[in-house]
Amino acid sequence: MATAGSSYSVSTDHQVSSPLVNLGNVAGVCIMSNAWKVEQEPSLINFISAFLSANSFRLNFVSIPPDLIFNCGGVSIAFVFVTKWDFSNVASIFSRVKRLKGQFAQLYVVATLSTKEQSDSFMRSYFQYEMEFGKPAFVQVTDAEMGFEKIVKIAHSRGVCKQQKVASKLKVERKRTVQDTNIFIRFVTSIPNINKHDANTLYQAIGSIEAIAKASKEDILANTDLSSKKADTLTRFFQDPEFYLSPKFN
């Protein structure tokens, strides 16, 4: 469903990667949705099969709600894998993600966004369908092969963490990330005329406060949906002393 009408073209410069570093004795199983499989080109399925084999994962085909489920190191992680961003199918992608979020405690969405138009469409849709930041986590990639490699690395890392009993450390890191995000949003929304939506957009598209401070007006306009006036306000706030040192009264 998430990849209805999807297509896949073989990249001539992609080869099956060598096994993951420090995989050790972690046994992994990849369960692939039958419905998702039939929507993909055989070349992609062949790449996936070879990559999993190289990294000591078994591959099973089963009728499951998400596109992929990885069982690794005692942890089950579900994935929605959008191999082609279909502009006409955006609503069903996000409604499916919301439904699966309630069914799987650990869910990731990996989306192939190979053009600026696709990336812009994703950003607009992310806010239009009121997704909660980080729930689930979205991972953007430029091609399907890269996307699957990231999926395996995510599953592998979660399995290793489970085996090493570092779940408490992950919880602390997650809390710290949320705190850092909240600090970022509070700081950016303190800038005149910049609201929470703008702050979230800047966080997704540009990143840190330092990166925004260095960004030009053109960079902000090219990577976000902010207006020209707001982009000008941001660049002046960070780069024009007369602007950021002057008092702001309504």
Swiss-Prot record:
Tissues expressed in: Expressed in roots, stems, leaves, siliques, flowers, inflorescence and anthers. Strongly expressed in meiocytes.
Disruption phenotype: Reduction in the number of class I crossovers (COs) during meiosis. Delay in the formation of synaptonemal complexes (SC) as well as a few unsynapsed axial elements in early pachytene nuclei in some meiocytes. Early nodules (ENs) are observed on the central element of SC. Reduced fertility due to altered male and female meiosis.
Signal peptide: none
SUPFAM superfamilies per the UniProt record, alphabetical: RuvA domain 2-like
InterPro entries, sorted: PTD, RuvA_2-like
GO cellular component: chromosome; nucleus
Any one GO biological process: chromosome segregation
UniProt enzyme class: hydrolase
Entry similarity comment: Belongs to the ERCC1/RAD10/SWI10 family.
Name of this chain's protein: Protein PARTING DANCERS
Species of provenance: Arabidopsis thaliana
